[in-house]
UniProtKB/Swiss-Prot annotation:
Belongs to the MshB deacetylase family. Keywords: Hydrolase, Metal-binding, Zinc. It comes from Streptosporangium roseum (strain ATCC 12428 / DSM 43021 / JCM 3005 / KCTC 9067 / NCIMB 10171 / NRRL 2505 / NI 9100). The gene is mshB. Gene3D superfamilies: LmbE-like. This is 1D-myo-inositol 2-acetamido-2-deoxy-alpha-D-glucopyranoside deacetylase.
Amino acid sequence: MTDRRLLLVHAHPDDETIGSGATMAKYAAEGAHVTLVTCTLGEEGEVIPAELAHLAADRDDTLGEHRVGELAAACEALGVTDHRFLGGAGRWRDSGMMGVASNHRDNAFWQADLDEAAGELVKVIREVRPQVLVTYDQNGFYGHPDHIQAHRVSWRAFELAADPAFGEGEPWRIAKFYFTATARSTMHRTAEALREADVSFLTEDAIDDLPFGCADEDVTTEIDGRAHVGRKLDAMRAHATQISVEAPWFALSNNIGQEALAVEHFILRSGVPGPAGPGAPLEVGGLGEPYDREADLFAGIH
């Protein structure tokens, strides 16, 4: 199809690159209109480079401003030209990890009024009119309050945008709503590759205890972004306060090695599945036979 429009909603700067960077770069390179909405500036993030430690929330509290620049550079690396902050930059603040005091700030995204935040996203949806929306599952992928809230806001906006009685602008019904996902088999394959490369990672048992990762059979869609993983790695390097990169590996502030995945997985939450496409090879992160998964987020949309 022509005139493809993809909307992604992520919680903080860097989430877009880690979870869907290869997919974003692929569709941007193919000429699709890719819109990224980021819900906060990531003010509560930890800072990796020692020389930038003063930016942290418990010191100068200027990390959010710095990460605006990092995100702009990452979007440039991915080829994405349409980026917005939900409600404008700084409207809602990073809530921090679940259970910390920053969850309770009045302007924390975790405290945002659902319909108000969703209303801001509806404005974007009705302007851009995307056929596809990508965000997190109801657990926020790994339980971060801002990721959970991004899911809630996205789902509510998905409903409200199609309602002619809500707000201003022409209603728009998004055809397909996806969650980002990481298949368990991919996590175990990555762990083995990291051990062979003598890179610190988790034990097999610890992987199964992580709050993310899904059964392979739950994955509905597999996007092969191998041709664009270089752009994903460049975007990761742009998020220098949050990510250290030694291709093909990267690490967050916990210094646990992970692979920059070139094949990214998604779960179709709402919409009609399109026809299955060719799967990526197992050795590069594909899920293998049976090849009954979509290979295109826009599959089946006419």
